[in-house]
Amino acid sequence: MAEAKEENREKNEEEESVKLFVGQIPKHMSESQLLTLFQEFAVVDEVNIIKDKITRASRGCCFLLCPSREEADKLVNACHNKKTLPGANSLLQVKYADGELERLEHKLFVGMLPKNVSEAEVQSLFSKYGTIKDLQILRGAQQTSKGCAFLKYETKEQAVSAMESINGKHKMEGSTVPLVVKWADTERERHTRRLQKAQSHIARLGNGDPTNPSLFGALPMGYVPPYNGYGYHQPPGTYGYMLPPIQNQAAFSNMIAQPNQGNNNALQGTSPDSVPPRLARRNFPMPPGNYMGSGYPAMRGHPFPFAYPRGIVSPRPLSSSPGSISPGMSTPLGIGLSSVVQTEGPEGANLFIYNIPREFGDQELAAAFQSFGIVLSAKVFVDKATGVSKCFGFVSYDSQAAAQNAIDMMNGRHLGGKKLKVQLKRDSNNGQPSSNPSLIS
C-alpha cells in the first residue's frame, strides 16, 4: 500500500502542476481551512489567498495548486458555479489562472525557418519526437512565410525532447543558421514585451532631440533655480515673445534696465533681426528665464541669457504644430518639420495603418515603424473640429522592402492595447497602390 502511494506521488511530481483561480470565497476563511475543503473534491497541494497589499486582508479570492491537469479538471467540474462556501453569498468561480491553458498546450515557437519551407517538411522533422496536434507557419499579407512557426505536441515530454534535439543544432536544407526552438510566449509575456517595447519607443522620443534633455521638457540636470533674491528678469512688455519691428528698436532696448552690469559684452541691445535663426522662428510658451549669475552663456547680441530655449511642460515651441516631428528627430527619421505636407515614398513603399492607439500622434507613429527602414513621413489623421485622432494614418518608406518588412512584422500586432491593421496604401478609385494618394480629412 505504501509503495503504491509512493509510486503515485512520483508520477504526480513528474507531471506539471496546474494553477487555478478561485473567486467568491469568504474573506474570514484561512488557507488551511480552504485547503481542507477543496481536498474533498480533488488533490490540492497548496492554497494562496490573494490579499490587499496595504491591509493584508483577504480579497475574497485565491490560487490553488493542483499536481496535474486531471486533478485541476476534477476540481473545476465539481465546484465551478456549483458550490457555495459557508458564509458566502455567491457560487464559487473556479477556472484556470491566466496563461495556464496556453502553458499546458505544450506550444513551441520555431524560428529561423527557410522562407520557402513547407508545412510538410516541418511536420516531417518534428514528428520524430512525438505526436503533433497543430502546426502553423506564420505568413505575411502576401502569403509569404515569415520564417517562423508554432506547433503543439500532445505531451510536455515530447516538446522538451524536440527542443533539446533541435534548438541551435539542426539546420534545414537551404538555411545557413540552425533552428531556434523554444516555448511559445503566453499572453501575459506578450503583453509585458509590448509594454517594454512601448517604453523603449518613448525613451527614444525623449532622446531624439539633442536640445531636449527629457521627454517632458524638464530642465537639464544640475540646473539651480534662481533663489538669490533677483529671480527671472525679462524686458518689460515683451514676456519672452518676439516683438514686431518698430522704429528705433535699439533705443527701445537701451531703455530697459540691463542685468549683470559687470558683463558689458553680454549686454548689447537686441532686435528681432539679431536673434540667431534657430531661435528667431520660435515663440516661447513661457518667458525664457534669466537670473543673476546664470550658468548659461549669454547669446551674442542679446541682453538676456536663456536658461532653456523651450517650454517647461511641452518640448515643442508654440510655433510648431502638435503633429510635427521635433527638429532633432528629423535626421534619424528623415521627417520634415511640416505636418501638412505628406512626403510620399516610391510605389509600393507607402502604408495605410488602421487601429492606431488614440493617444498616438505623428511622432509616436514614426517611432513605432522606424525600426523597419527609413521613414520618409508619418501622418495620423485627426478630426478637424475636435482635434481627436481618427485612429488611422499613413507611413511612407524609402523602399518597398522596408514597407513589406513593416507589414510582415506589424500587421496583426498589438500596440497600446489595439490590434494594428497594416497594408499597402491603395488608390480608392481602382484598388491599386497609389503614387499620389489624396489625404483623407
From Swiss-Prot:
<keyword id="KW-0677">Repeat</keyword>
<comment type="function">
    <text>RNA-binding protein involved in the regulation of flowering time. Acts as a repressor of the activity of SOC1, a transcriptional activator of flowering time. Binds to the 3'-UTR of SOC1 mRNA in the cytoplasm and participates in SOC1 mRNA decay, mediated by the distal region of the SOC1 3'-UTR. Acts as a positive regulator of salicylic acid (SA)-mediated immunity. May act on SA signaling-related genes at a post-transcriptional level.</text>
</comment>
<dbReference type="InterPro" id="IPR035979">
    <property type="entry name" value="RBD_domain_sf"/>
</dbReference>
<keyword id="KW-0287">Flowering</keyword>
<dbReference type="GO" id="GO:0005829">
    <property type="term" value="C:cytosol"/>
</dbReference>
<dbReference type="GO" id="GO:0005737">
    <property type="term" value="C:cytoplasm"/>
</dbReference>
<keyword id="KW-0694">RNA-binding</keyword>
<keyword id="KW-0963">Cytoplasm</keyword>
<feature type="compositionally biased region" description="Polar residues">
    <location>
        <begin position="258"/>
        <end position="273"/>
    </location>
</feature>
<feature type="region of interest" description="Disordered">
    <location>
        <begin position="258"/>
        <end position="282"/>
    </location>
</feature>
<protein>
    <recommendedName>
        <fullName>RNA-binding protein BRN1</fullName>
    </recommendedName>
</protein>
<feature type="domain" description="RRM 3">
    <location>
        <begin position="349"/>
        <end position="427"/>
    </location>
</feature>
<dbReference type="Pfam" id="PF00076">
    <property type="entry name" value="RRM_1"/>
</dbReference>
<dbReference type="InterPro" id="IPR002343">
    <property type="entry name" value="Hud_Sxl_RNA"/>
</dbReference>
<feature type="domain" description="RRM 1">
    <location>
        <begin position="18"/>
        <end position="99"/>
    </location>
</feature>
<feature type="domain" description="RRM 2">
    <location>
        <begin position="106"/>
        <end position="186"/>
    </location>
</feature>
<keyword id="KW-0611">Plant defense</keyword>
<dbReference type="GO" id="GO:0003729">
    <property type="term" value="F:mRNA binding"/>
</dbReference>
<dbReference type="GO" id="GO:2000028">
    <property type="term" value="P:regulation of photoperiodism, flowering"/>
</dbReference>
<dbReference type="GO" id="GO:0006402">
    <property type="term" value="P:mRNA catabolic process"/>
</dbReference>
<dbReference type="GO" id="GO:1990904">
    <property type="term" value="C:ribonucleoprotein complex"/>
</dbReference>
<dbReference type="InterPro" id="IPR000504">
    <property type="entry name" value="RRM_dom"/>
</dbReference>
<dbReference type="GO" id="GO:0080151">
    <property type="term" value="P:positive regulation of salicylic acid mediated signaling pathway"/>
</dbReference>
<dbReference type="InterPro" id="IPR012677">
    <property type="entry name" value="Nucleotide-bd_a/b_plait_sf"/>
</dbReference>
<dbReference type="GO" id="GO:0009626">
    <property type="term" value="P:plant-type hypersensitive response"/>
</dbReference>
<dbReference type="GO" id="GO:0009908">
    <property type="term" value="P:flower development"/>
</dbReference>
<keyword id="KW-0687">Ribonucleoprotein</keyword>
